[in-house]
A protein has these predicted regions:
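Long, structured ligand/cofactor-binding scaffold of large enzymes
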Residues: 22, 26-29, 33-222
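Mobile "lid/hinge" segments at catalytic clefts and subdomain interfaces of large enzymes
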Residues: 18-23, 177-298
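N-terminal mitochondrial targeting presequence
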Residues: 1-20
Length: 298
């Protein structure tokens, strides 16, 4: 990773600052997830669960309440009731992070309740070239970047300064891990799902829910299974898979669904290819995409 993450050392801060209380990146608590899964199974009548259901239900704050009366009928949950979920991590881009942080500041908390990060990339516009565009952004957006860094330092949020890289690549390389439930304030946040987590794009109000550990509510998605078999022909890439799917489903065909990929064909695709497929799932309106672990995820 060639980007630069700012912790204690100030870059654009308006004060000297102190040691940042930065949450470490963390792997999911797999033992706890498995324990909760064992509690969930009787609530759904012992029916087989899809991968996306396992990932969601193991993050329920109170499975006995949210799955009460569901039994083995999946239609009583999917698209029919709201799930109250605990979030593992939050990522915010610079344009949408401003209002989320301003709202968080009114909550009286000393730091973010979950590991979180802010990434300065959306306010850097392309005109001439990388260096010239970066310098122009530093000049025109200086106050915004100073506010974001100062707030991040105060509330224990990791700050990725201008020039660090694009939020989706940074999250994929540094924070995504199989089993996580992540939110991000960008519609293409599902890019991180390429490493086996569930990453979902949200608005600023939902980001504040995550920052304050307020139960995040999601209408239980329906599940759209995509069976991949064989391998891609020469000159084809993972992007062609999602482009074909988008052609079949159109721009709203995935609305309210998690697209869950399975089959031997997954073993032939790189993790970056899976990330591309999940990223572009936003173009069909999908909540996110889910992939089982493959060796390509490392």
């Amino acid at each position: 990773m060639h980007g630069v993450r700012v912790g204690a050392r100030a870059c654009f801060a308006t004060h000297a600052g102190s040691e940042a209380r930065v949450h470490p990146s963390r792997m999911p608590r797999y033992a706890e997830l498995l324990e909760q899964l064992s509690q969930v199974r009787p609530l759904v009548g012992g029916r087989p669960l899809t991968l996306s259901e396992k990932l969601l239900y193991t993050h329920l704050l109170d499975p006995a309440v949210d799955l009460a009366g569901a039994g083995a009928d999946a239609s009583k949950v999917r698209g029919a009731r709201y799930l109250r979920l605990g979030i593992d991590r939050l990522a915010m881009q610079d344009a949408s992070a401003q209002m989320a942080l301003l709202q968080f500041m009114t909550c009286g908390m000393s730091q973010s309740a979950v590991p979180a990060s802010v990434h300065c990339d959306h306010l850097i516009q392309a005109f001439e070239g990388a260096q010239a565009d970066l310098e122009r952004s530093l000049d025109t957006q200086r106050e915004v970047f100073a506010f974001l860094e100062s707030a991040c330092q105060k509330y224990g949020i990791e700050f990725w300064r201008p020039g660090s890289g694009i939020i989706h690549q940074i999250v994929l390389e540094n924070y995504a891990a199989p089993g996580l439930l992540m939110l991000g304030t960008d519609s293409h946040t599902p890019n991180a799902s390429g490493l086996g987590c569930l990453a979902i794009g949200v608005g600023g109000a939902d980001a504040v829910d995550a920052l304050t550990a307020t139960p995040w509510e999601l209408l239980a998605p329906k599940v759209l299974g995509v069976h991949l078999h064989g391998k891609l022909s020469p000159w084809c890439s993972a992007k062609d898979v999602i482009l074909h799917l988008a052609g079949e489903l159109t721009v709203r065909g995935g609305t309210g669904y998690i697209v869950e990929y399975f089959g031997a064909g997954l073993q032939t695709l790189p993790a970056t290819g899976l990330a591309t497929m999940s990223n572009m799932g936003a173009e069909i309106g999908a909540t996110t995409s889910a992939f089982p672990y493959t060796p390509a995820m490392g």
